[in-house]
């Protein structure tokens, strides 16, 4: 059986910070050099990287535990430890991170097609003993251990991002329509449930525009109660700009088909059921279908209904224009999203405008260094 990897449970951890060092300066003619232990390095971060060329989560099936490297320990002469290597997990666009216990969404990447996002920060490195020198303790033998990293179990869920989602009963012609308009080559055969996994195709409009079309397995009556394959994959068209309902005119239940599909979508998600749509009546080349097409338009007068025949290539240009129009309409009404800041990095740091930056160099036979001083601009009192 063909399996589509659209969900995976994994354990992720950031790295532990390196331990601070206890060391003392030991040089000739410097009998009491004082502490010189450096700080530990920061642990590596756990990072998700969105890659536009990925389509499934199959790579997460083979490995379930991901951990960033720990930071290196501090060393003498106030040398800091090495920062731990980050752990980067590649993901396809449209992923959502969920809590396995509550099912709540922790992080939604939205429509991002590329970029890196820190999910777990590495632990801070521990202080070396040079931080603990005081007027009464000139040779401290104290250092701090590195901060522990974070560990979480999460569910990574993939929701395919498409402009148009194709919805219909098995053998309604969804895969054939996808094959005609795009370079996708889904399996096409004259028996139900030929499509077992979602398929994506790209309808090329011009040099700057594409329309992404998603084909999911056929939906049966009672799908919301677990019958058939299609209901499991409805989440993959939940983010689509609009829906195309395909109704087979050669099926005797063609008049009930639209109502059944609407009912199953509403049972799954009211938001999905309210999306803009067009109705495509297929197999218009078969006997008695032209009369049925007229009856269908009379039965659903408030919806746009287009008739097509893939065999004779009737009405396909009108369907193409309808897909482009629907995608363009939703793009214009799409709200502008703020840039994703999943870990709140921008809120954890204080920013300041600097009024003056100065430094003083010290360079003699044994030492080289610099003292840097920063002065902050003060806000005027109101």
Swiss-Prot record:
Compartments reported by the entry: Cytoplasm
Keywords: Cytoplasm, GTP-binding, Hydrolase, Magnesium, Metal-binding, Nucleotide-binding
SUPFAM superfamilies assigned: Obg GTP-binding protein N-terminal domain, P-loop containing nucleoside triphosphate hydrolases
Record domain OBG-type G: where: 162-328
One term under GO cellular component: cytoplasm
Primary localization: cytoplasm
Annotated positions binding GTP: 168-175, 193-197, 215-218, 282-285, 309-311
An example Gene Ontology biological process: ribosome biogenesis
EC class: hydrolase
Disulfide bridge map: none
Residues given in the record as Mg(2+) binding sites: 175, 195
Residues annotated as domain Obg: 2-161
Cofactor(s) required for function per UniProt: Mg(2+)
InterPro entries associated with the record: G_OBG, GTP-bd, GTP-bd_Obg/CgtA, GTP1-OBG_CS, GTP1_OBG_dom, GTP1_OBG_dom_sf, OBG_GTPase, P-loop_NTPase
GO molecular function: GTP binding; GTPase activity; magnesium ion binding
UniProt region (Disordered), positions on chain: 360-382
One Pfam family named in its UniProt record: MMR_HSR1
Keyword Cytoplasm: yes
Enzyme Commission code: 3.6.5.-
Subunit structure: Monomer.
NCBIfam families, sorted: Obg_CgtA, PRK12297.1, PRK12299.1
Functional note: An essential GTPase which binds GTP, GDP and possibly (p)ppGpp with moderate affinity, with high nucleotide exchange rates and a fairly low GTP hydrolysis rate. Plays a role in control of the cell cycle, stress response, ribosome biogenesis and in those bacteria that undergo differentiation, in morphogenesis control.
Matching PANTHER family: DEVELOPMENTALLY REGULATED GTP-BINDING PROTEIN-RELATED, MITOCHONDRIAL RIBOSOME-ASSOCIATED GTPASE 2
Family: Belongs to the TRAFAC class OBG-HflX-like GTPase superfamily. OBG GTPase family.
Record's protein name: GTPase Obg
């Amino acid at each position: 059986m063909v399996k589509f990897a659209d969900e995976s449970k994994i354990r992720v951890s950031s790295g532990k910070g390196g331990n601070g060092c206890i060391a003392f300066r030991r040089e000739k003619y410097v009998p009491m050099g004082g502490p010189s232990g450096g700080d530990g390095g920061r642990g590596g971060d756990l990072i998700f990287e969105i890659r536009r060329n990925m389509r499934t989560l199959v790579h997460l099936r083979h490995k379930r535990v991901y951990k960033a490297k720990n930071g290196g320990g501090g060393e003498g002469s106030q040398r800091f430890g090495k920062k731990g290597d980050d752990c980067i997990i590649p993901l396809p666009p449209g992923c959502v991170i969920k809590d396995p216990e509550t099912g709540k969404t922790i992080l939604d990447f939205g429509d991002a097609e590329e970029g890196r996002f820190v999910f777990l920060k590495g632990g801070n490195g521990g202080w070396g003993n040079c931080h603990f020198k005081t007027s009464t303790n000139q040779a401290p033998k104290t250092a701090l251990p590195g901060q522990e990293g974070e560990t979480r179990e999460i569910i990574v869920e993939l929701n395919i991002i498409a402009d148009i989602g194709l919805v219909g009963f098995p053998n309604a012609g969804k895969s054939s329509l996808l094959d005609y308009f795009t370079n996708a080559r889904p399996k096409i055969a004259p028996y139900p449930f030929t499509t077992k996994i979602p398929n994506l195709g790209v309808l090329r409009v011009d040099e700057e525009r594409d329309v992404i079309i998603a084909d999911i397995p056929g939906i049966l009556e009672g799908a919301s109660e677990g019958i058939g394959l299609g209901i499991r994959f409805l989440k993959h068209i939940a983010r689509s700009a609009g829906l195309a309902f395909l109704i087979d005119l050669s099926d005797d239940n063609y008049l009930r088909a639209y109502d059944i599909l609407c009912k199953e979508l509403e049972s799954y998600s009211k938001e999905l059921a309210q999306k803009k749509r067009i109705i495509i009546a297929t197999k218009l080349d078969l006997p008695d279908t032209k009369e049925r097409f007229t009856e269908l338009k009379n039965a659903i007068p408030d919806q746009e209904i287009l008739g097509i025949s893939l065999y004779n290539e009737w009405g396909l240009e009108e369907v193409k224009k309808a897909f482009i129009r629907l995608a363009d309409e939703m793009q214009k009404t799409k709200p502008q999203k703020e840039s994703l800041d999943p870990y709140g990095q921008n809120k954890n740091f204080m920013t300041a405008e600097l009024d003056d930056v100065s430094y003083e160099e010290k360079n003699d036979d044994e030492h080289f260094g610099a003292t840097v001083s920063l002065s902050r601009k003060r806000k005027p009192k109101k």
